[in-house]
Amino acid sequence: MASLGILVAGVAHEINNPNGLILLNMPILREVYQDAEEVLETRYHEQGDFTLGGLPYSRMRNEVPCMLEEMQEAANRIKRIVEELKDFARQDTSTTTEPVDLNNVVKAAIRLVDSSIRSATRYFETCYSPSLPMIQGNAQRIEQVAVNLILNACQSLPDSEHRISITTLYDQEKDSVMLKVSDEGIGISPENIPHLTDPFFTTKRETGGTGLGLSVSASIVKEHGGSLEFDSEPGTGTIVALTLPCCRRT
């Protein structure tokens, strides 16, 4: 796994450099075309149709702005994929830990993805158990898991009329705290559930999923001595339960 991480880091770096140039230059190209569009339109209306890039301008005048927009979106998508690859390669096993309040971590995660939540659903509910015991861990790493689970829930919804619920609670019997992320999304096929945390396994390949988000999350949870459990029914929704042990009491 360490060798795979090194390979992935190298590939991510090689992809990131040329994509960085695309992201840098695309806004400039879009502005250039906007400035040139007035001249092109004047010629089109005064002299009739002409070719642009070997194709009729009457066609390209509508298609070029769409092409530029698609290129910008594709470059942003590559950037997101590279960031996931780098997260996978990093696999930070830092032993720097501290007492962590799960409620605060979840609230911070929700703030980070607020725009995605608002775009995905009109019905977002939270229920925080009061006075949760502290857990021992790395708050930033646990927040990364919470962000991933919430974004997955957002992406699973067929429309904004479906609900997402976030709940924290304390399991006294197991002396552990739990985060439950429930959605009314499309659900997960039973045969896919055992593979959800496998590296590079994804049911969202066509929309740019890398299959690394849950793999990285599972590694972080394992570092903290916790567990990730999935309960899903196709067409009904999914419940993901993150369980983490509480701090040892002295």
Kindly give the residue locations of the regions a language model identified.
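Histidine phosphotransfer helical core of two-component systems
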Residues: 14-76
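Conserved catalytic submotifs in the C-terminal HATPase_c
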Residues: 107, 120-133, 169
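Short beta-strand-loop-beta element adjacent to the nucleotide/active-site pocket used for signaling
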Residues: 164, 169-179
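Detector for a conserved hydrophobic position within an alpha-helical segment of the HATPase_c
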Residues: 220-222
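Conserved micro-motifs of the catalytic ATP-binding
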Residues: 91-95, 134-137, 203
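Short helix N-cap motif at coil->helix boundaries in the Bergerat
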Residues: 102, 187-195, 209
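Short alpha-helical Gxxx[C/S/T] motif in the catalytic ATP-binding
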Residues: 213-217
